[in-house]
């Protein structure tokens, strides 16, 4: 009876979060999707467009960090649903606006609301799934972004051409509002909310003094493993962003390839990333099922290191072997391999940061490593392009390659340090 109950609620809750987060991501990109139609009606230059999109990016980075902390303090169900409601309302108001300052202000609010989406998902997944299932379902949930990112441009373009860009934003916003209330009804924070026994993924310390055993924020921040994960995530996300943002320019400007090959490389990278995310979750869950969580080391480390090494090798081959005469298939293979090797670790860092933290601080832990990833994404922008400007794209990619190799080597040396963050009882030690 209990097993059927868990299965039913897991299916309903996961489906609600998958659909809800697909809408989160679609409505994060709606401005980009309808941009061609919008500029036909309202003349905006590149600076205006950049200002509007940058306002959202800055707000999203801040909000995602704050939301991670809030998910440890309040209901994840309410946080997720409230954010989706706000995203929908902002898109509706955006549809009836016409000036750059209003566009930027509303898209900043969109960014703030967007940050409320993912951290509650991680919190709910950890409460409802065993450690040996957590990585797989985390990875599958993350593919909601690939789904929205793949179908979104086509759907938005068809709607904008058939009706208008305003109708597209208003319709997608209204759908968010409706689904936000459905998510509030269907998502439950933990099994106890529906009369089922809570899962306990962490080693039990006994009921007596359990509240005293809760770790503090200071103890979490003093855990060396938190900063090992944060540094690794910064490097992996930064290097991945280098390739996704500048890979096309490198191929076209320095390797003499066509724009079509450049865009095809990006598509291959995203397809490889989709497969890599799911594979990383599934394979690392199998390792977790065999070995289980411990205070030192993590069964997911082996796959994480393998994929980080794959990133380094594929970047080296991309930089050294590609020429103007290279077979197109070889370039696509390199893109797919890099996508597979980079999106896998991105999924794993989030999973490990969540499961290695104390239950009362797992959202905060994920928020911290996620913030460091955003720092990596920032470094992949102007600093990376500055190196390319003063030297060459090849030199810039060589720097990223060396940093990735050094990070992989350092993570290998530190793979068996204490991985349980926060307070550890004397018995566990």
Curated annotation (Swiss-Prot):
SUPFAM superfamilies: MFS general substrate transporter. Changing residue 28 to H: In GSD1B; inactive glucose-6-phosphate transport. It holds the Pfam family MFS_1. It catalyses: D-glucose 6-phosphate(in) + phosphate(out) = D-glucose 6-phosphate(out) + phosphate(in). Inhibited by vanadate and chlorogenic acid. Keywords: Antiport, Congenital disorder of glycosylation, Disease variant, Endoplasmic reticulum, Glycogen storage disease, Membrane, Sugar transport, Transmembrane, Transmembrane helix, Transport. It is a multi-pass membrane protein. It is found in: Endoplasmic reticulum membrane. The keyword Ribonucleoprotein does not apply. Its main location: endoplasmic reticulum. This is Glucose-6-phosphate exchanger SLC37A4. It comes from Homo sapiens (Human). The lineage of its organism: Eukaryota, Metazoa, Chordata, Craniata, Vertebrata.
């Amino acid at each position: 009876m209990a097993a059927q109950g868990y299965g039913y609620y897991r299916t309903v809750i996961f489906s609600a979060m998958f659909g809800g987060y697909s809408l989160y991501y679609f409505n994060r990109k709606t401005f980009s999707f309808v941009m061609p139609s919008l500029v036909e009606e309202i003349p905006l230059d590149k600076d205006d467009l950049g200002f509007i999109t940058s306002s959202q990016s800055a707000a999203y980075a801040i909000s995602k960090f704050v939301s991670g902390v809030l998910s440890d303090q309040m209901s994840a169900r309410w946080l997720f649903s409230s954010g989706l409601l706000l995203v929908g309302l902002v898109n509706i108001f955006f549809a009836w606006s016409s000036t750059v300052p209003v566009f930027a202000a509303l898209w900043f609010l969109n960014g703030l609301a967007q940050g409320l989406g993912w951290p509650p998902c991680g919190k709910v997944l950890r409460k409802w799934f065993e450690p040996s299932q957590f990585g797989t379902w985390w990875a599958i949930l993350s593919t909601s972004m690939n789904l929205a990112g793949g179908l979104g441009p086509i759907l938005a373009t068809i709607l904008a051409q058939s009706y208008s860009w305003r109708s597209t934003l208003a319709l997608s916003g209204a759908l968010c509002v409706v689904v936000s209330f459905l998510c509030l009804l269907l998502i439950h924070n933990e099994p106890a909310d529906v009369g089922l026994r809570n899962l306990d993924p962490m080693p039990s310390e006994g009921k007596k003094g359990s509240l005293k055993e809760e770790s503090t924020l200071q103890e979490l921040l003093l855990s060396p493993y938190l900063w090992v994960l944060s540094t690794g995530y910064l490097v992996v996300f930064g290097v991945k962003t280098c390739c996704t943002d500048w890979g096309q320019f490198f191929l076209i400007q320095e390797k003499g390839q066509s724009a079509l090959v450049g865009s095809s490389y990006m598509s291959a990278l995203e397809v490889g990333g989709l497969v890599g995310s799911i594979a990383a979750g599934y394979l690392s869950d199998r390792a977790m099922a065999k070995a289980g969580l411990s205070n030192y080391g993590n069964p997911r480390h082996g796959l994480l290191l393998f994929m980080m090494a794959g990133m380094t090798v594929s970047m080296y081959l991309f930089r050294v072997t590609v020429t103007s005469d290279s077979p197109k298939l070889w370039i696509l293979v390199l893109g797919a391999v890099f996508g597979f090797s980079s999106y896998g670790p991105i999924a794993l860092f989030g999973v490990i940061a969540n499961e290695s933290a104390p239950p009362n601080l797992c959202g905060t832990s994920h928020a911290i490593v996620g913030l460091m990833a955003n720092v990596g994404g920032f470094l992949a922008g102007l600093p990376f392009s500055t190196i390319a400007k003063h030297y060459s794209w090849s030199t810039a990619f060589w720097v990223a390659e060396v940093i990735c190799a050094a990070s992989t080597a350092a993570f290998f040396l530190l793979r068996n340090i204490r991985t349980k963050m926060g307070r550890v009882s004397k018995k566990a030690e």
